[in-house]
Amino acid sequence: MLQRAYRFLLSLWRRAASNPEALQRRIDAQISRAVTNVGSGNLARARLELSKALEEAPRHPGALKVQTCVLLELGALEEASQAVARLQSLTPGQPEVAVLAALVEQRSQTPAPDWRGALIQAWNRVGRPDLVEAEPFPSPLPDTTAFVERVWERTQSPEVRFTAMLADGASDAQRQWLAAHVAGLEDAALLLAAYEYFLPRSGEDALADVRRQARETLRRKIEPLIPRMHESEGPLLLLLGESAKEASLTQENIHALERIAGLPRYRRTSLAQAYADAKQRLELTAVTAPPLRVLQAAVASMVTDAVVILWTRVEATKEHLSAEDRVRLGRTVFTLGARIAEGATLSDRMLGLRHMELGAEWMADVEKLAQVKRELEHGRAVAEASSALQVDSWPLPSLHRAWLQASLDDEWNSLSILVAP
């Protein structure tokens, strides 16, 4: 019996050896399993998968990159140095390998810089390469069951189910269910997010009536809250959400915008609070929610559509105003933009600055326009630098936690360090 099993396994090995594509697929799967285990914190299992892959393909760059990251995560710095040195000899000139090697060196210092600081220093040291076009780190295995499905199986709560939809996406059937149950939403931030979620979408006529009915229900719940709001996001969303995006503003709209611009803040909820709220809701289901899923839900719950609509409608109004009214509207748009730009996220900062730029142009305020353009240039540099690092792709949970926390504390300031002089 044992001999028969041994012969069977040997035949499988020979078949794989004679089929390089099958062998490559198996090795790639082992590496993806290793990355999946890294993400779940099972580093011992990840090392086992990597040892199997490297036994068959000792020169596999992806396996060596993940191995270096696992050793870094474990604090095995000498082994990590050896692994990355081997990787460098096999892949000379690869920018992501250069950054990884510099990261190992940074973390080997005494005292070692924190994960976030170490990566930034490593990236700066090797010339700040753009890793968007670099050879990516291996990816984890795809989920066999969608996150939203796992959450929906555990709860009937509209708020929890909607949070899962924001974190992962949804089917038409799930959207229809939520539309029929939006009356069960109570949290003000989720009410606004749901209203935005059900705004008309181009090319989706099959759900047009469903979206409209959901918005009608949500508007009835939101409108009584508006007088008590000290933030402009809710009133702005209700004012512009239903309108044709390319239509010019009416005088009534302009008066309403002036009132909205007089409110002291744009956001009612910070990214950190939105993250904490989403995490708390998802934890009720006992489904493990990866931090990036929670972050996606938090970001998606912070409404932005009204700001984009405002831009297009203001632009469409330009030719219908007198010079005096144009200056007046420009002042309103500049003020609203400034409120939005006070947010701590990169998105809010850039959206706000774009509206401030438009407002300054309409006011013909040369000094303000020049200042805003400088800030926009800085913001674009920050966005490009953030993208260049490709932090989400690094299989380093400690780095992800540190980066996430800095973003929740103050994303704009934490990313501005990337382009600090």
Regions picked out by a protein language model, each given a short descriptive name:
Residues 39-40, 73-74, 106-110:
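Register position in tetratricopeptide repeats
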Residues 53, 86-87, 181, 225, ...:
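Canonical positions in the second alpha-helix
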Residues 24, 58, 92, 183-186, ...:
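Short coil turns that delineate tetratricopeptide repeat
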